[in-house]
């Protein structure tokens, strides 16, 4: 009996955690190469969902810090779930061979082979086997951080975001990276970090690259440089990884109390447009669709009620029906519009439509029927000047 209970518990809990899968690929350029693929917690339970990817060089020791912050951020819906590809390089002289470059500062020998392996063999293998999205991040440390910059030398870079931690740069890289960034037109993110206690040569070249990037006029890319006081070559990684990931996904987070108070409530109009624009911009920036959060609908509803902009409840209803069809969400906003503008008969009919719809959080069928019942017998009083209502449910930091 205890064994059966253990097996049942194991099957139930297995789907709650990310899964690590060791992989081996027979490369035409490099022979056998091993790597680890980490799929997110929802991978098995959401078979239609696709995920952006993070390629971690020096995977033996960089995987854990990146996986940790991504799992934490995904729990709070601050960060998207991702597939992580961690390449093993820390045996013998492999990481140095993989990053080999010539006197001119370009990949050569085994470095050129590794460069092509990632784009021509590794990613095609991963894309075929796993449900991936085109948005790709690459991260590395010292030697491999310098190596990842080579992908910016291509006219159509393989990656959308670059995380360079204490980079050891090839000749002229501090100039070439900045030059390449001026010519790339697609959305791109570049993050660099150094530690005060690191080697002088690493910090000087990184500072020169930072200076070159900062003078680029009309930059079309996102850039952040962190120089950590008191950090060593190794301790800077723990400081930089959260900063880097949150830099790349800045704006992805749900509407916070600060955003609600300082931006949304201060609008004269266009509350629903604000919500629509937020998710349109996220899709444009990251190249994948993000389903609008229920907490964000609640935030916009609260702003509409606070500012008596009741006409905006109808476009909010349309937006809800688009993303949550056949649920009570859009119907609730429609009914609330009629109620707030004194059209009680229409409000009752709208509330009653929820009887055949799927409930969304607290907007249950009973909740909607009770709202309808409370309006029965009230004569219509159509008006656009209904009294203001102070919302009791403002957005919170915790979302489901």
Locations of the language-model features?
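Non-catalytic cap/lid and distal C-terminal segments of serine-dependent acyl enzymes
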Residues: 19-344, 348-383
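Absolute protein N-terminus
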Residues: 1, 18-19
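Long, low-complexity, intrinsically disordered segments
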Residues: 387-400
């Amino acid at each position: 009996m205890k064994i059966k209970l253990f097996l049942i518990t194991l099957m139930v809990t297995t789907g709650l955690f990310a899964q690590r899968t060791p992989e081996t690929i027979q490369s035409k350029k490099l022979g056998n190469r091993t790597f680890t693929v980490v799929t997110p917690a929802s991978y098995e339970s959401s078979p239609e969902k696709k995920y952006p990817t993070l390629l971690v060089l020096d995977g033996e020791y960089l995987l854990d810090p990146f996986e940790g912050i991504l799992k934490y951020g995904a729990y709070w819906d601050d960060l998207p779930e991702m597939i992580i590809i961690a390449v093993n390089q820390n045996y013998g002289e492999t990481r140095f061979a993989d990053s080999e470059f010539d006197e001119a500062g370009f990949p050569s020998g085994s470095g050129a082979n590794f460069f092509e392996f990632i784009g021509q063999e590794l990613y095609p293998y991963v894309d075929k086997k796993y449900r991936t999205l085109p948005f790709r991040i690459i991260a590395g440390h010292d030697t491999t951080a310098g190596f990842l910059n080579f992908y910016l030398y291509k006219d159509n870079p393989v990656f959308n975001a670059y995380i360079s931690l204490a980079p050891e740069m090839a000749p002229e890289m501090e100039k070439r990276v900045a030059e390449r960034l001026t010519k790339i037109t697609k959305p791109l993110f570049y993050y660099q970090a150094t530690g005060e206690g690191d080697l002088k040569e690493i910090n000087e070249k990184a500072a020169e690259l930072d200076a070159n990037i900062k003078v680029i006029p009309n930059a079309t890319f996102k850039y952040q440089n962190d120089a950590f006081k008191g950090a060593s070559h190794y301790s800077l990684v723990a400081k930089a990884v959260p900063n880097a990931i949150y830099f790349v996904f800045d704006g992805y987070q749900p509407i916070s109390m600060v955003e609600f108070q300082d931006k949304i409530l201060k609008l004269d109009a266009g509350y629903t447009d604000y919500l629509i624009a937020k998710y349109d911009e996220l899709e444009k920036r990251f190249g994948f669709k993000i389903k609008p959060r229920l907490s964000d609908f609640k935030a916009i509803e609260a702003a509409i009620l606070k500012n008596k902009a009741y006409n905006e409840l109808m476009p909010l209803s349309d937006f809800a029906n688009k993303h949550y069809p056949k649920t009570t969400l859009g119907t609730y906003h429609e009914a609330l519009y009629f109620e707030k503008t004194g059209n009680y008969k229409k409000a009752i009919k709208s509330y009653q439509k929820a009887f055949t719809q799927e409930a969304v959080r607290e907007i249950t069928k009973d909740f909607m029927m009770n709202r309808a019942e409370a309006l029965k017998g009230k004569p219509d009083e159509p008006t656009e000047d209904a009294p203001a209502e102070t919302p009791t449910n403002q957005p919170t930091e915790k979302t489901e």
